[in-house]
């Protein structure tokens, strides 16, 4: 028998994105036969009870081994940060992800934006070795513009935070949550 993996997948969601998140759940469950179980964690940005029920039903009707759990981040931490049509408060909540998962023993988690569709076995992405890196992510194609706007040196990288593999231990060791919040407090107008 092959060694099948249990996966921890995290998303942030508000009520407007519930249909997208449900589609993402189904796309993962239908396209990831090598996963023994998928544990979905949703950082809840004001989901209604009916939305949570719909998401639970989506998961249970598509897999006997998948679960969904809702997590609550302290939104007050992010209330004074720049919000636009491109960056919402919901987007900031992923920064709290490692602290929200402290009671679990995950070494690695996969973060996916709620509107992500998965068309292949997600285990392949989940198994990507991080090789002493805190996250695995894709450099944003608009990096040159973003670097200039954010005042980031060109040797640093601006990445798309919609798909990230996160080494929870390294994230915590390097105090990424605290450093990110500090950066946002000091550069919130960019």
Briefly describe each language-model feature range.
Residues 1-190:
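Glycosyltransferase catalytic domains, chiefly GT-A lineage
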């Amino acid at each position: 028998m092959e060694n099948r993996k249990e996966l921890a997948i995290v998303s942030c969601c508000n009520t407007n994105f519930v249909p997208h998140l449900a589609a993402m759940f189904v796309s993962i469950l239908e396209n990831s036969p090598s996963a023994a179980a998928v544990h979905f964690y949703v950082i809840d940005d004001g989901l209604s009870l009916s939305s949570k029920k719909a998401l639970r039903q989506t998961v249970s009707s598509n897999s006997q081994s998948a679960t969904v759990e809702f997590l609550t981040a302290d939104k007050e931490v992010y209330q004074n940060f720049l919000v636009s049509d491109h960056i919402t408060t919901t987007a900031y909540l992923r920064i709290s992800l490692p602290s929200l998962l402290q009671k679990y023993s995950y070494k690695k988690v996969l973060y996916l934006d709620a509107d992500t569709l998965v068309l292949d076995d997600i285990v392949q992405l989940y198994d990507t070795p991080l090789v002493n890196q805190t996250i695995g992510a894709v450099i944003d194609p608009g990096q040159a513009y973003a670097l200039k706007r954010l005042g980031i040196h060109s040797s640093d990288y601006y990445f798309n935070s919609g798909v990230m593999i996160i080494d929870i231990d390294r994230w915590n060791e390097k105090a990424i949550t605290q450093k990110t919040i500090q950066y946002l407090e000091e550069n919130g107008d960019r």
